[in-house]
């Protein structure tokens, strides 16, 4: 067995209690011919000092924009949301996060708005985000996460899950990983390796060297272990 448990500790801070009702925004995922919900994903704002420090740590020009892009792509690929072009945004990210001008977001037909900011606190990545109901002019949810900088991609997936669940009522699936058997080499001598990746295809890693045949990998739902079939001295074994 291979332990794939990630020791990621998030400090989840509820800034404001989410309103109990869904307001005017509802995404019905049970009916056919669904019109995706127009959503504006504003780039997460970041102060100059934090931007510079994270650029050195992560080799990213703007980690706030990178996290926002992950959220945008996740929502789009779900088929339930239509992220609007940032070229149409009328309000700067830092101002929108403090107090959105809902008339501006209504003007570009956004029904939901996601804002937030990124800061460096003692070399930790702190990400705050807010979900707004543009039609009702209300905040729906506000959360914050603190983690090590290298977990910035996962923060984007977790935000996506929170937004998805808040707007659809169904649990999100973006912060998940896929275990699979990768094949390479010529047709007459294929090499199979156990591999794992994020659900969006990022962070692909090989878990075995390809010295032995591997088949049928499965996640254990209780302890986050991976079980797979392999052959040792031509005998099948479960690992």
Give the label of every model feature segment.
Residues 25-26, 95-162:
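Amphipathic beta-strand/beta-sheet edge segments enriched in Tyr/Trp
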Residues 28-101, 114-117:
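Short beta-strand->alpha-helix linker/helix-N-cap micro-motif
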Residues 188-205, 225, 229-239:
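Beta-propeller blade-edge and WD-like acidic-aromatic loop motif
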